[in-house]
Design a protein with these regions (language model features):
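Short glycine/threonine-rich loop-to-helix capping motif typified by GTGT followed
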Residues: 130-136, 261-266
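C-terminal nucleotide
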Residues: 22-34, 38, 59, 63-93, ...
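Intrinsically disordered, low-complexity segments enriched in serine/proline and basic residues
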Residues: 2-13
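ATP-binding N-lobe of GHMP and related small-molecule kinases
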Residues: 22-135, 142-155, 160, 164, ...
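Short acidic, glycine/serine/threonine-rich loops at helix termini
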Residues: 49, 130-133, 170-175, 193, ...
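Residue-level detector of intrinsically disordered terminal segments
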Residues: 11, 21-22
Length: 294
C-alpha cells in the first residue's frame, strides 16, 4: 500500500523527491570511529596518544542538487532534515547540524568552490559513547565533499578542517587525535601519534591469549555538555604559571614532574592534579607502546 508507505516514510520520501530528477554524481564516504588505548587528555597538550580505528563507522552520501547555494542534509538516525545556504549560515543552538555546517565552513575557508548539494548520513558508531561519532561524521563529510567537487585537499587538510569545525561551529576545543585516527587509522593496527609534530607510527596489536574488551557503561556523554573545555583551560592555566619561571615551556608536554612540583603551592589543587595527570600520562603512553612492541 503506497499510501501507508508514504505515511511511514514521509520525511525520507520528500527528501529524495527533491533530488531524484537532478542527481548527477553520488559520492559515498566512510570514516571510522576510534578507541584510545591510552593517552587521555594529552592530545590538546601536545602529548602522545595511542588510538586505533574500529569497525564502527559513519557513512555520508552527497550529490549535487543543481542549485547554486542550497544544501539539504538528512540525518537517518534522527530522521530530521536541515537546509542551509552556502552564502549565509550560522551555528544553531546545538545538534548534528553544527558538525555538518562546520565542515562546510572550514572547507570554504580553504577556498573550496562548493555548490548546492544534498546529502544523507548514518552510522554505526554509538552516539555519546566516547568512540568519536562526531569526528567520524565530520571526516566522512569532508572526504565526501572533497571527492564530489574534486577539491584536491590532502588528508591532513581534511583532518584539520574537521577539527576546526568542532572548534569554531560546535564550540569544543578538541585536540587532533579523534579526526586523525578516523582518517588515518588502519585495520588491525594501533597508532602512536605525537600530537605536536604529528609524526605517527603504526604497529600491530598482538596480545597473544589476551583481548581488549570494549564495555558499554550505558553512560552517554556529549563533549559539548561536559567539562572538556574547562579541563583544557585548567591545563593552559598551569602552563601559564610555569612559564613565568620557565619561559621556554610551550605546553605540558615540556614539563617534568620535578618542575611541576615547584608550583604546588601556587597552583590550585585541581589545576595541579590536571597537570600532574598529563605529564604522567605521556610517560605511560610511551611505556605502554614499548611494552606492546615487545
Amino acid at each position: 500500500n503506497f499510501t501507508r508507505y508514504l505515511g511511514q516514510n514521509r520525511l525520507k520520501y520528500f527528501f529524495y523527491k527533491w533530488t531524484i530528477n537532478i542527481m548527477k554524481n553520488k559520492i559515498t564516504a566512510h570514516a571510522s570511529g576510534r578507541i584510545n588505548i591510552i593517552g587521555e587528555h594529552t592530545d590538546y597538550n601536545d602529548g602522545f596518544v595511542l588510538p586505533a580505528a574500529i569497525d564502527k563507522k559513519s557513512t555520508f552520501r552527497v550529490w549535487e542538487n543543481g542549485t547554486a547555494n542550497t544544501c539539504n542534509i538528512l540525518s537517518e538516525h534522527f530522521q530530521v532534515t536541515h537546509q542551509f545556504d552556502l552564502t549565509d549560515f550560522q551555528p544553531v543552538k546545538s545538534g548534528w547540524e553544527n558538525y555538518v555546517m562546520g565542515v562546510v565552513a572550514e572547507l570554504q575557508k580553504l577556498g573550496a568552490p562548493l555548490k548546492g548539494f544534498d546529502g544523507s548520513f548514518d552510522g554505526t558508531v554509538p552516539i555519546g559513547s566516547g568512540m568519536s561519532s562526531s569526528a567520524a561524521l565530520e571526516c566522512s563529510l569532508a572526504v565526501a565533499l572533497n571527492e564530489l567537487f574534486d577539491l584536491g585537499f590532502d588528508n591532513w587538510q581534511l583532518i584539520k578542517a574537521a577539527q576546526m569545525a568542532e572548534h569554531n561551529f560546535v564550540g569544543i576545543k578538541c585536540g587532533i587525535m579523534d579526526q586523525f585516527a578516523s582518517v588515518m587509522g588502519r585495520k588491525n593496527q594501533v597508532m602512536l601519534l605525537d600530537c605536536r609534530s604529528l609524526e605517527f607510527e603504526y604497529f600491530p596489536l598482538e596480545l597473544g591469549d589476551y583481548q581488549l574488551l570494549l564495555l558499554n557503561t550505558n553512560v552517554s556523554h556529549a563533549l559539548a555538555d561536559s567539562a572538556y573545555n574547562e579541563r583544557r583551560a585548567q591545563c593552559e592555566a598551569g602552563v601559564k604559571m610555569i612559564q613565568q619561571k620557565y619561559p621556554d615551556i610551550l605546553n605540558l608536554r615540556d614539563v617534568s614532574l620535578t618542575q611541576l612540583a615547584e608550583f604546588k603551592n601556587e597552583l590550585s589543587e585541581v589545576v595541579y592534579r590536571r597537570c600532574q595527570h598529563i605529564i604522567g600520562e605521556n610517560d605511560r603512553v610511551l611505556a605502554a607502546t614499548n611494552a606492546l612492541k615487545t
